């Protein structure tokens, strides 16, 4: 992983609640960005 990816990882986790139904659309967007 590059430093850029390492910097974006915590930011993505912060935007991803990973709880409830919100995890579904958020996870899909996260995979698309990656």
Curated annotation (Swiss-Prot):
Cross-link type Cyclopeptide (Ala-Pro), residue numbers: 11-17
Post-translational modification: Processed by the macrocyclase-peptidase enzyme POPB to yield a toxic cyclic heptapeptide. POPB first removes 10 residues from the N-terminus. Conformational trapping of the remaining peptide forces the enzyme to release this intermediate rather than proceed to macrocyclization. The enzyme rebinds the remaining peptide in a different conformation and catalyzes macrocyclization of the N-terminal 7 residues.
Signal peptide positions (record): none
Keyword Metal-binding: no
Single annotated GO MF: toxin activity
InterPro entries (UniProt xref): Amanitin/phalloidin
Cross-link (2'-cysteinyl-6'-hydroxytryptophan sulfoxide (Trp-Cys)): 12-16
Chain positions listed as propeptide in the UniProt record: 1-10, 18-34
Keywords: Thioether bond, Toxin
Family statement drawn from the similarity comment of this UniProt entry: Belongs to the MSDIN fungal toxin family.
Reported function: Toxin that belongs to the bicyclic heptapeptides called phallotoxins. Although structurally related to amatoxins, phallotoxins have a different mode of action, which is the stabilization of F-actin. Phallotoxins are poisonous when administered parenterally, but not orally because of poor absorption.
Protein name per its UniProtKB record: Phalloidin proprotein
